[in-house]
């Protein structure tokens, strides 16, 4: 793998990460609207999760590649900093996943509340078993 190939791979990871952040922002924007589209929110959320998985797998590939091409000589410095960076990145990924889960729960509550309000305004549907 040439240096240009490595840079191109890292560039594609960066672009995927930007797509991931864009999707998260679009999902949040959709949830903040007064009239939320559940389909649009789910589409953006699914795109976010897909992009996040791609970024995670590509970064893992790069880490594995770097491990394989290492000289095999013991490192004179400490590996603590790299391990800490990796740990913090993993923590951030987990945090983002938990925030997405919270957003999904908020979305469900919002949709349920909206449905209740619509039912109260329009009354029960004729086929819903209401007394006539």
UniProtKB/Swiss-Prot annotation:
The answer, when asked if Ligase is one of the entry's keywords, is: no
User: Pfam family example for this protein?
Assistant: Med11
What main location does UniProt list?
nucleus
One GO BP annotation here?
regulation of transcription by RNA polymerase II
- Identify the InterPro entries for this entry: Mediator_Med11 (IPR019404)
Q: Which UniProt keywords apply?
A: Activator, Nucleus, Transcription, Transcription regulation
GO molecular function, a single term: transcription coregulator activity
The UniProt family comment states: Belongs to the Mediator complex subunit 11 family.
The free-text function statement in the UniProt record for this protein reads: Component of the Mediator complex, a coactivator involved in the regulated transcription of nearly all RNA polymerase II-dependent genes. Mediator functions as a bridge to convey information from gene-specific regulatory proteins to the basal RNA polymerase II transcription machinery. Mediator is recruited to promoters by direct interactions with regulatory proteins and serves as a scaffold for theQ9P086 assembly of a functional pre-initiation complex with RNA polymerase II and the general transcription factors.
**How does this chain assemble?**
Component of the Mediator complex.
Name of the protein described by the UniProt record:
Mediator of RNA polymerase II transcription subunit 11
Gene that this polypeptide is encoded by: MED11
């Amino acid at each position: 793998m040439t240096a240009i190939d490595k840079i191109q791979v890292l560039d594609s990871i960066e672009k995927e990460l930007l797509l991931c952040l864009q999707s998260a922002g679009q999902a949040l924007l959709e949830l903040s609207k007064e009239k939320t589209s559940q389909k649009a929110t789910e589409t953006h959320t699914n795109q976010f999760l897909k992009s996040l998985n791609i970024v995670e797998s590509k970064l893992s590939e790069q880490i594995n590649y770097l491990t394989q091409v290492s000289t095999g000589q013991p490192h004179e410095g400490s590996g603590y900093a790299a391990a800490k960076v990796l740990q913090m990145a993993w923590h951030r990924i987990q945090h983002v996943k938990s925030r997405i889960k919270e957003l999904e729960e908020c979305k469900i509550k919002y949709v349920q509340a909206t449905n209740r309000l619509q039912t109260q305004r329009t009354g029960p549907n004729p086929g819903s078993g209401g007394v006539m």
